[in-house]
């Protein structure tokens, strides 16, 4: 169910949860156990945040420095899959402009569609540590409004669903 439908059909207040994907090294069971106490409140949906990957500069033997990608967290898509495997609750992953090319966003949309996830929070995202201003990823989106248009354009083509012979719907993703 789309979160917009949940909100429109609600006559009383209800909780929702927002979680940050855990650091690498946590098990699936530990993740689900950490969420369990909140499930007693019967949330209608769970938001799963997303953050840019970080980089660090390491000195090479010749004295120069090279940039190395650091991925400290489990992906929001993986966290959504874990939640869906145990709980009957809508998951709402965040997609961000920063750190993603347009093609990487489309790949994430393919994965979300494959999993049956059709709710998304589209954000520009934060600047990288040490940046004074947000710098878009080359080949990516600069603004959340561009990301939303990219998602709408993607869902309009329903590339993934058509390639799998599934029913198409121009309103597949709720943004």
Give the ranges of each region predicted by the language model.
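Glycine-rich, proline-tolerant flexible connector loops at the mouths of alpha/beta enzymes
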Residues: 41-74, 128-139
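N-terminal amphipathic alpha-helix/helix-capping segment at the start of soluble metabolic enzymes
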Residues: 1-17, 159-172
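Hydrophobic faces of well-ordered beta-strands that scaffold small-molecule active sites
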Residues: 15-21, 44-48, 91-95, 120-122, ...
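Flexible, glycine-rich active-site loops centered on histidine and acidic residues
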Residues: 101-149
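Active-site-proximal loop/turn and secondary-structure-junction residues that shape catalytic pockets
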Residues: 19-23, 50-54, 97-99, 124-129
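Alpha-helix-loop-beta-strand connector modules within alpha/beta enzyme cores
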Residues: 60-93, 139-174
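Acidic (Asp/Glu)-rich catalytic clusters
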Residues: 5-10, 35-42, 78-88, 109-117, ...
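Short, acidic/polar
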Residues: 25-39, 102-109
